[in-house]
Amino acid sequence: MVVKAVTVATADEGFFRALQQSAQRHGVDLRVLGCGEKWGGFGWKLRKLAEFLEACDPDDLVLCIDAYDVVFLRPLDDLETWYRRHVADGGAPVVSSIEDRGGIGDVTAGVLFGRCRGTLLNAGTYMGTPPALLALLQDMCRAGACDSRDADDQRLLTSACVRRPDLVDID
């Protein structure tokens, strides 16, 4: 199992440079998709991720992260061990991070994005094996949801989490 980190970034803005520097500092092989392309919406982003996942070894562990507000705070050395233990203990094969806004921000985000099992998910970081992530993306994009320019990956992830507790866990 190889641990891979992937993001979709069309431009060098936000914290993208900080993400790249943190990846380099911690020895993370960060794959950047969409560089120099025109942003096509979240459905486009999810299709880019699907293309990448289809080319990965099915036993890889892939960390999908947002390009503009995520940084690495340490190497990914122990992520594979943690993930294997999580799945061996009966955990779902996709693990999503949570959003911890607190106060009125928590209420607002809950209204905008919804909740899964009472928790705000964060589509900025989720991981799994390529087959599990492809199943997630397929569920997220069901019924043409990814074809809309209004599609939002956080809402789509939350809806998939609600529908598929067997597929998505919350960390």
Language-model segments: residues:
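A conserved donor-nucleotide-binding helix/loop in the catalytic core
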Residues: 38-65, 71-75, 118-121, 152-157
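Short coil/turn segments at secondary-structure boundaries
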Residues: 17-21, 35, 76-78, 138-141
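Conserved donor-nucleotide/metal-binding helix-loop-beta segment in metal-dependent transferases, i.e.
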Residues: 70-118
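Generic preference for well-ordered alpha-helical elements
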Residues: 13-16, 46, 69, 73-76, ...
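Catalytic core and acceptor-binding pocket of nucleotide-sugar-dependent glycosyltransferases
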Residues: 120-171
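N-terminal anchoring/stem segment of glycosyltransferases
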Residues: 1-61, 89
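Aromatic-acidic/polar surface patches that form glycan- and anion
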Residues: 12-15, 38, 42, 116-126, ...
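A generic structural motif
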Residues: 30-39, 95-100, 149-154, 171
